[in-house]
Structure formats: C-alpha cells, structure tokens
C-alpha cells in the first residue's frame, strides 16, 4: 500500500486497516482494537507478546482499565507526571479490552499517550488504537518510512511530506514499560523514562 496523508491514515485506521505513523519513541504499527490479529499476523508475532493501547489523552484510556479508587489515584499521578510521554503502564484490563490484544494474559493491558503532535492528532481522530513498534517480531524497530513500506507492503504509512510538515522526530528508543503489582511498579523494560 502507498504512503498516505494524515486524513488517509485516519480513514484507513477507521476502516480496520493497519497503518504506521511516527511517535515520540519509534514508529508504530496501529489498528482499530477489534482488528488486532492483523498486527500479530503482519509482524509474525507470537501471542505472548501483547499489543498496547495508545490514545490522544489519558481520559480516552481509563475505561480500558479497572482498579479501586486508591489504585486509580496512583495511576493518575503517574500519568500526570509522565504523559504525554515515553511510559507504557501495564494495568488490570477491563471487560472493554478485546482479548485479541493480549491473548495469553487478557487480564492486563498496556496503555500510553505519546508525546508526539502528529501521533496525538491521528489518535484524536481515530480514538484508541492497538499499537506496537514497526518491525518484524524479534527484530530492531524500523525507523524510516521506506523500511516500513518494504517490510510491510500492505500497511499505509504516513507520507514523508506530512512528516516534514510536522517536523517529525523519533527518539529511536522504546518506551519504558512498568507493570502495576499490588501497590507498586515493576519495570519490565527500561526505555526513555527512568522510574
């Protein structure tokens, strides 16, 4: 599939197609959550490596997690400190999360709000998307549109002209992943944010 404008990326995502756009960390593959299996197939990804939900704001994500009032206050403090940004929180999943996002452990879900203007513009128009880094499973993230198009020819990739207009820069470093564990955080992957 060719590159697309921002409007074409939004339309493709809303139509259940896999798209790619830059984030503050590495470029993402993204799809509407009910179509998550398309990303697993494209990446040749095993089901023990879940996808995450990405949104334009924290408010868009709270319905996808469940916890008591005290836990939610702790989680919101983390998001107020680090979001938008390069921190993925793994929290207990609500019934709203499609099991296809985390087939091996549907009781949890990773959530993130990127600190990237164009990613948040797209997510603001599409709503929450299931995402992962743009790469084949087990390989390094792809950082350029041409590499993404070569590896994933059926994915609509945000056009270079759109990237230039927005001054797009990826850090190239993945997000930090922290999982909530009974009153505390367990860092599963150290990335751009240090906890």
Residue ranges of each PLM-predicted region?
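Active-site-adjacent structural elements in enzyme catalytic cores
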Residues: 1-195
């Amino acid at each position: 599939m060719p590159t697309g404008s921002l409007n074409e990326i939004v339309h493709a995502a809303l139509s259940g197609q896999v798209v790619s756009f830059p984030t503050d960390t590495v470029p993402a593959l993204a799809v509407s959550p009910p179509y998550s299996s398309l990303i697993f197939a494209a990446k040749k990804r095993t089901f023990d490596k879940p996808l995450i939900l990405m949104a334009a704001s924290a408010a868009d994500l709270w319905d996808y997690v469940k916890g008591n009032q005290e836990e939610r206050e702790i989680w919101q403090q983390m998001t107020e400190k680090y979001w938008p940004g390069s921190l993925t929180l793994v929290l207990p999943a609500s019934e709203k999360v499609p099991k296809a996002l985390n087939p091996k452990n549907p009781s949890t879900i990773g959530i993130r709000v990127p600190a990237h203007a164009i990613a948040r513009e797209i997510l603001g128009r599409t709503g929450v998307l299931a995402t992962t880094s743009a790469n084949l499973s087990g390989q390094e993230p792809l950082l350029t549109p041409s590499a993404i198009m070569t590896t994933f020819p059926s994915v609509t990739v945000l056009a270079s002209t759109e990237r230039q207009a927005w001054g797009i820069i990826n850090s190239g470093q993945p997000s930090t992943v922290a999982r909530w564990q009974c009153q505390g955080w367990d860092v599963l992957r150290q990335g751009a944010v240090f906890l």
